[in-house]
Amino acid sequence: MAGGHKTSEMRVFPNGGLSLTDMIYAVRSMMLDPIHVGVQIESDARQQDILLGNIYAYLGMGVPILLTGILNREDGSSYGDGGHAVVINGYECKDDFGDTKRSLISSGIYKLLVHDDQVGPYASIEFEQKDIPGNAVACPCKGKCVRAIDGSPKVMTRWRTEWNENGKPLYFSPLNLIIPVYNKIRVSYEDVRCYVIEIHDAFDVVIKSLQKEGRLPNKKDFVFQWSIRLRTCCDYKKSVRNDPDIWLQQDKLARLTMALPKYLWEIKVFVNGKINALFVVDATDSGCGMRVVDAYMYYRNMEEMWNWLLLTEGNSRKMVRNPIFAKLKEMAG
């Protein structure tokens, strides 16, 4: 299947392995749409958050994710002649909601479990990571570190694999994610993430402003974090039925009997580690439409916080196309 697009002069399965195009063609031959995410975490550390966000979002629904990259030695030199590909089938994530630097829960992933045909199922790729300053630029050591503008070395994320050379570990430099999805799922993780980050940044500005006015205590008391996951309608309703925080039976019944599309994006908002709000987006809509089909506020005494966001001058103009903001305005009446 992967080689079906090749001309007669080309080998169907070359000795050098499959190219990215071959893999994408194989996914399409199964009547699925491949979502391609290119990442270069050595040149931009923020791209790791995008990569981990995609893994967290799609893997929860059982979507197998193909990860390609290059194996490197500890000194940054390449190992082997070509790239390497693995299938991600799990991860481990820090359950630490007090980390104010993480706006997305997915950024707490610190280990991937992958199927590596040369190691076996559930081989691990662990992250060795320390804080990176916002003004850091890439150092030529290919992912081993970054250097701040003042020249002081800072340790950067390295992906340590179970591969080794003469007892020394090899490191993985990710290049591409290929995510096979049903073609009716038109809204991507990136579509949702952009709107979520827009709301999160607006909240950050509002909270700082209120703290300056003395209307709010220290910022550490208001840590906002977001979870973005693809769900089926059945899985979503099952989670609603078993959710102890939705304690009013009429609220549960309304959601269990609601007509919903088959595929949904479930967006949860946590404040200080406690779930605060839920937004559900139609994943089968167009990316530019992105309809919010359900929303729920868990604690009524927190609604004032959301109203601050709505009432802050300029937010309505800036987020005129943000469907989450529009849903908040609708709920506020």
Question: Could you tell me what each predicted segment is?
Answer:
Residues 2-145, 237-332:
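Conserved active-site-adjacent core of cysteine acyl-enzyme catalytic domains
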Residues 16, 44, 48, 149, ...:
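Intrinsic-disorder-associated interaction segments
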Residues 208-211, 218-241, 249-252:
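C-terminal accessory extensions appended to soluble enzyme cores
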Residues 113-217:
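Conserved catalytic-core surface of thiol
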